UniProtKB/Swiss-Prot annotation:
Any one of the GO BP annotations: protein refolding
Purpose of the protein: Redox regulated molecular chaperone. Protects both thermally unfolding and oxidatively damaged proteins from irreversible aggregation. Plays an important role in the bacterial defense system toward oxidative stress.
Molecular function terms, GO-annotated: protein folding chaperone; unfolded protein binding
Organism: Clostridium botulinum (strain Kyoto / Type A2)
Any Pfam family hit: HSP33
Family, similarity comment: Belongs to the HSP33 family.
Name listed for the protein in its UniProt record: 33 kDa chaperonin
Subcellular location: Cytoplasm
Gene behind the chain: hslO
Major site of localization recorded for this protein: cytoplasm
Membrane-spanning segments: none
Phylogenetic classification of the source organism: Bacteria, Bacillati, Bacillota, Clostridia, Eubacteriales
InterPro entries linked: Heat_shock_Hsp33, Heat_shock_Hsp33_C, Heat_shock_Hsp33_N
């Protein structure tokens, strides 16, 4: 099933929905970072959440960054997303892996940890970005985001995120949804949706059966006048470049850069998001010193 993200409403706008299949997107992120199974599930859930939330941005220049740091062996997960559905991310420890939890599922909470915070950072080109922060609720990511929306944005929300890792460590299925009750929505409607979400199969199970994201949402919102508003293709895409890495190298400061120039013949930097390596020769480091600090 091809990746697809849709935005929809139900019950005459009382409910706002963003849903997506993200199997290929997550597969690419997991491949780039060579993740162990539990790390793959954690990164995949965050990438899916980022893709969903990024589409709420107003401008293509805006960015949304999700960070979760719970003190666990995952060493944090960071994802940055954009309005057009493209997303990038990394996990601090891609080899993080532990035994399944009591339900036989990959123990994402176990590697994330619960001693920390979930941050949502919206950079809309203003002087300061908007930063929302809540304590980690369960470490399962979906429940943490639902808690964030309810506490930080006062929007009752249900967030479902799923990643099914195959035996060969590829991603068999991945996807998710964010369901939000709009101001003035019928409380009984919220109860009905909550009941349905408890009764349905997992989103990865539905994707594995070949259901499209539209069919999944139709199944959840049967008899609720689901109205699909728009659709896009979410994608894992890193926008790193040699120029950006050069600026990052220059930003460490004149003193540290001079030490590198004096001590090494070559400096290699890797992009956090895609692991692409950029090598700078001794002469190139000297040129950076000269162009940024008029020193060599």
């Amino acid at each position: 099933m091809k990746d697809k993200l849709v935005k929809a409403i139900a019950k005459d706008g009382q409910v706002r929905i963003i849903g997506a299949i993200t199997t290929e997107l997550v597969n690419e992120g997991v491949r780039l970072h060579n993740c162990a199974p539990t790390a793959a599930a954690a990164l995949g859930r965050m990438l899916t959440a980022g893709a969903l939330m990024g589409t709420t941005l107003k401008s293509e220049k805006d960015t949304l960054t999700l960070q979760i740091h719970g003190g666990g062996i995952a060493k944090g997960v960071v994802v940055t997303s954009y309005a057009d559905g493209h997303v990038k991310g990394y996990i601090g420890n891609p080899t993080a892996d532990i035994e399944p939890n009591s339900k036989g599922k990959l123990d994402v909470s176990g590697i994330i940890g619960k001693n920390g915070n979930l941050l949502v950072i919206r950079d809309m080109g203003l002087k300061e970005p908007y930063i929302g922060q809540v304590p980690i609720y369960t470490g399962e990511i979906g429940e943490d985001l639902a808690y964030y929306y309810t506490v930080s944005e006062q929007t009752p929300s249900a967030v479902g995120l799923g990643v099914l890792v195959d035996k060969d460590l590829s991603i068999k299925s991945a996807g998710g949804f964010i369901i939000q009750m709009m101001p003035g929505a019928d409380e009984m409607l919220a109860d009905l949706i909550s009941y349905r979400l408890e009764e349905i199969p997992s989103i990865t199970e539905m994707i594995s059966k070949g259901m499209t994201i539209e069919e999944i949402l139709e199944y959840i919102f049967e008899d609720m006048d689901l109205n699909i508003l728009e659709s896009i293709v979410p994608e894992y895409r890193c926008d790193c470049s040699r120029e950006k890495v050069e600026r990052a190298l220059a930003s460490i400061g004149q003193k540290d850069l001079k030490e590198i120039y004096d001590e090494v013949k070559e400096e290699e930097l890797k992009c956090h998001f895609c692991n692409k390596a950029y090598a700078f020769s001794h002469d190139e480091i000297g040129n950076i010193l000269e162009s940024y600090y008029n020193e060599k």
